[in-house]
């Protein structure tokens, strides 16, 4: 796995490795399981889980985790939940976890008990939108998640919602007006939301985008806003398997594993040359090529967007701040991508061979780099979910 982009929203980046829940190889027994900072009841449950046969699976988080979270440690294991963690949905100051038993747990600045039987959620700093039973509900964050929902839409028989933000007849957002319509003829496999734009993956692998386009995040070649879903013509004819939206950038993965990026590259989140990052590097570092890490393409890739203005005095380097149409990204060793996710100003991708993530430094980067944390700990990455300023990774022992 590799990551690119902005390392932290401010100076708040926590990068020193800290593993609270070690994953032990199969056959080591419960005596070797340590559970620091965990209540005894949950620690006992963890010991029982770790004693079960078969490879163990867990979620890890890198980067900013909310003001209520302890600082220190670049890699932190997310505390396991009974029934396992089925979904991870990060917001800026907190994260929502949906367990295999339909329970919703909130971690970070916002914590509280919400109704059970949750299938999915969309968090934001103003509301938490839930798919619960046969209804869509929006709960106001400012009320401390008490009382009833601020908005509710019951699903009629035969209607199905999800994966969120998809909903019957359109899509939902975790802020008013909550429900937005889509053209009836437009079918969707997946829909993702950026700060000011949306991207939709159709059944045939086509990609549609709409919303604000001032940073090139729509991929139509211009910077004008688009009010209705429009086909990204540059990708037409190449079936896509996945799509992701960052704050002001977009990424898609073809069925063959190729990675396409477009939009804002100020922090190198597109893995294209960034003038802003080049100016921050020491002169020697800017002129000397970085040595390639062994097996760099074998895992999760963190992507960063770079500035598009030409740099005065730069030698043979074209900097990119805005990429207004999809660009095919060459990953090291020709790696094929299986999954991709975007944060506010960073991108992470899991390759089909292995998966790694989590650079042990707070500096931004506009180069795809393998994350050595997971192979060093005998783990293979299965999934990745980016929050605005962090990255959650699901990994299993090899």
Report each predicted region and the residues it spans.
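Short glycine/serine- and acidic-residue-enriched loop/turn motifs that recur at repeat junctions
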Residues: 2-4, 24, 35-87, 98, ...
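Conserved core positions of repeat-based scaffolds
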Residues: 61, 94-97, 106, 127-130, ...
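Canonical WD40 repeat/beta-propeller blade segments in eukaryotic WD-repeat proteins
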Residues: 85, 118-119, 187-190, 196, ...
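Surface loop/turn motifs at the tips and blade-to-blade linkers of beta-strand repeat domains
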Residues: 78-81, 111-115, 180-183, 233-235, ...
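Blade-level signature of beta-propeller repeat domains, shared across WD40, Kelch, NHL, RCC1
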Residues: 372-398
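Short loop/turn positions that demarcate and connect the beta-strands within blades
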Residues: 82, 90, 115, 185, ...
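Conserved strand-to-loop turn within each blade of WD40 beta-propeller repeats
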Residues: 195, 203-204, 212-214, 247-248, ...
């Amino acid at each position: 796995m590799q990551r690119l982009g902005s390392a932290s929203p401010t100076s708040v980046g926590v990068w020193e490795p800290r593993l609270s829940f070690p994953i032990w190889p199969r056959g080591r027994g419960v005596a070797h399981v340590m559970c620091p900072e965990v209540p005894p009841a949950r620690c006992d449950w963890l010991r029982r889980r770790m004693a079960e046969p078969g490879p163990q699976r867990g979620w890890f988080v890198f980067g900013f985790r909310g003001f209520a979270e302890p600082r220190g440690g670049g890699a932190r294991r997310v505390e396991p939940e009974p029934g396992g963690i089925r979904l991870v949905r990060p917001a800026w100051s907190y994260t929502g976890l949906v367990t295999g038993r339909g329970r919703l747990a909130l971690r970070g600045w916002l914590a509280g008990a919400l109704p059970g039987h949750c299938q999915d959620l969309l968090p934001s700093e103003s509301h938490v939108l839930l798919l619960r039973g046969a209804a869509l509900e929006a709960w106001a964050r400012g009320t401390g998640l008490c009382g009833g929902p601020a908005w509710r839409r019951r699903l009629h028989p035969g209607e199905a919602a999800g994966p969120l933000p998809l909903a019957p007849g359109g899509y939902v957002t975790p802020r008013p007006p909550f429900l937005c319509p889509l053209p009836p003829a437009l079918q969707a496999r997946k829909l993702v939301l950026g700060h000011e734009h949306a991207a939709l993956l159709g059944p045939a692998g086509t990609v549609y985008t709409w919303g604000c386009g001032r940073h090139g995040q729509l991929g139509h070649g211009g910077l004008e806003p688009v009010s209705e879903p429009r086909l990204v013509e540059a990708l037409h004819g190449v079936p896509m398997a996945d799509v992701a939206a960052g704050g002001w950038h977009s990424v898609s993965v073809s069925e063959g594993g190729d990675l396409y990026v477009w939009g804002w590259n100020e922090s190198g989140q597109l893995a294209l040359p960034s003038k802003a990052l080049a100016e921050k590097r020491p002169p020697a570092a800017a002129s000397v090529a970085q040595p390639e890490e062994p097996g760099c393409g074998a895992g999760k890739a963190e992507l960063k967007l770079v500035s598009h203005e030409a740099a005065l005095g730069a030698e043979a380097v074209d900097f990119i701040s805005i990429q207004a149409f999809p660009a095919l990204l060459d990953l090291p060793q020709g790696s094929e991508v299986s999954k991709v996710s975007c944060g506010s100003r960073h991108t992470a991708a899991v390759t089909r061979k292995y998966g790694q993530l989590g650079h042990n430094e707070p500096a931004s980067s506009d180069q795809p780099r393998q994350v050595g944390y997971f192979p060093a700990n005998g783990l293979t990455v299965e999934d990745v979910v980016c929050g605005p300023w962090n990255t959650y990774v699901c990994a299993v022992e090899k």
